[in-house]
Amino acid sequence: FLVGFDATVISGAVPFLKTYFDLDSAAGSLKLGWAVSSLGWGAMAGNACAGYLSDRWGRRSVLLMTAVLFLASSLTAALATDFGVFIAARILGGLSVGAAILTAPVYIAEIAPARSRGSLVSVNQLMIVIGISVSFFSNYFLLSLGENSWRWMLGVQSVPAALYFTLLLFVPESPRWLLTKGRTAEARSVLESVQGAGAARAQIEVITASFANKARRVGFRELFAARFRVLLLFGFGIAFFQQATGINAIFYYLPTIFGQAGGELSSAFAQSMLVGLVNVGMTFVAIWLIDRLGRRPLLSFGVAGMAISLLTISWAFHAQGHERIVLIALISYVACFAISLGPVMWVLLSEIFPSEQRAAAISVVGFWNSLVSASVTLLFPAEVAAWGPSGTFLAYGLLAALGFVFLTALAPETRGKTLEELETMLARPARAGEVH
């Protein structure tokens, strides 16, 4: 929840930051980009160190650290009177976002019973989307506080951050991590509280056996061996198009975009709430459809819809006076993203790489995804200043169209296959749709 909330709460503060820090000039456009994208740059650092720290200190300890960082970041950003301090606070928040977004799913997967592991990990992703939506509602209701409302928008995050920290105090450590440290009695106690005594004994035997048969570690350079190049090309490609088509830039600047379309400030915030609700609703739809229709149909339909929606937004800005069309097309764009590139990318990345390469590959591709996201968010204000909203959304639309061609050509269908079956099927370059 905090990951989604912290990432998008900045959208409400943008109109006020432009005034408070004097960011309306051409040079200010790039500074505004830094203010908004700083969380993304911090998240990259959090991504990079999360795995090492969670292996060394434990999953729970890292999550507690992220709670402290969330709290410190929100209060420092809310009280900042200097632009540099504000940037530092947002980078601090990014560290917590980057660490939490990788550590939380690992913790859930390691402590949850096998029968409910998939649904619980999915709920984690759903909570991020809900956090995004709640941030839009929070911003709307705090808007009436006047010129300092941006401070309240950023500072209110301290409440769920403090609650998050408090609840983590009552959460046990990951039993798998405890076993890696030889703390068998503690691991048994945790598993018994979650799964019962009999299941706990069996689970400890399975985990211990997996340590004995643990696959060799894969070096970074080995990921780029010839046999993995097509899979890596697809991984880097889908990660690029997920962010290069503008999703985070749109979320982070959403009220500003609606304002540029001609809406009043309060109306722009209200429209952002509607977009957030659509995002949540369509994420539920994606969870329901992904194992029924498959990955490729969702990707093809969703990315095509994104391209059409973005090009429609570009036209509406060019023609001017079409605020309602901008709203409808943005809702369509977010809905299409929420059933395609949003959830499907991470599902495919967790499926297509062989087990001994999976963790390293997802880490590398995830870092690339964060880099593209931060870059697109940084450049958005400067692009709007140089090209106008119409030109900016035209560029996003053309990239989405290119993404449709790329994904249609290379995306495999993995529905209904075990990971072991997929390893065999994807061991060589496959034609589009070969995996059924």
Which sequence ranges carry the predicted segments?
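Alpha-helical transmembrane bundle of multi-pass membrane proteins
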Residues: 1-186, 190-192, 212-436
